[in-house]
């Protein structure tokens, strides 16, 4: 509480969450959806939310994430539509994973979408959209790595979605 009070006194928002796991899932709903989709599409948050087909895919993936969260005992406090609207309001922002892709850096998708797919396995949740996007990201990561090796740039570790 003292940390939160100090941050608030400094003019920052710093709520103390009683159910941190629920709030983590709210964040993960966005990251596990928009980071991999942005890498596959090259699009900003607003563009993905405005395009009917990527918005539908994002909503489907979020529904899968919510099902996994519920089976894991979490109760995220935001609706899918509210999460999508929030992402769209962020505007023409490129996700950190898309920025990494454009900079030629390793893609850190294992901690993002692969973790959700692992939790789907543990909770016996189908999550076909999440799995399909993870598979496409895994192939992208492998293709990038092969291209770098063939170009003589040396192998760079890539945390791929599997």
What positions do the PLM features span?
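NAD(P)-dependent Rossmann-like dehydrogenase/reductase catalytic/cofactor-binding core
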Residues: 8, 47, 59-162
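Internal alpha-helical scaffold of NAD(P)-dependent oxidoreductase catalytic cores
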Residues: 1-77, 82
